[in-house]
Amino acid sequence: MFRSIVVGTDGSETATKAVRQATELARAVGARIELVSAYEPVSDARLREESIQVPADLQWMINPRDDVQAMLESAARGIRAAGVEVEVFALQGDPADAILDVAEERGSDLIVIGNKGMTGAKRFLLGSVPNKVSHHAPCSVLIIRTV
């Protein structure tokens, strides 16, 4: 049935619900999970050009890859604890494009994503990622009602 399930997450509470449900499904059918998140760093040049002072609690936005990778690894530990094989992908760029690219590259049979997503930086417009993914996916899409 399903061998490879791509799961998009931004680390939010709603995305975590989708990850949990995808993990249960993967365990039930013996599939592996490809866990995907995307980030878009703010360039130092742009910060200097616009004289932007970044508060300490938002420094992750300048080079968020490490934080995204840490969030993915934390989620992956929970998936592995459930007995499911998982690989993580922290990709720079648009979240929907990252999910679609991984699904295509890995030959995935299913994409699981929450119906709403939001981060502290509000880089996910509510509903825009699942909408784009559902319209352009190379495989079936399961949209989890998370709110």
Predicted regions and their residues:
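A short acidic, glycine-rich active-site loop
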Residues: 54-70
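Small/aliphatic-rich secondary-structure junction motif
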Residues: 3-56, 82-84
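Short secondary-structure boundary segments
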Residues: 37, 115-116, 146
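Short, conserved catalytic or interaction motifs in soluble domains
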Residues: 123, 138, 146
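Structural beta-alpha unit
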Residues: 1, 14, 51, 74-111
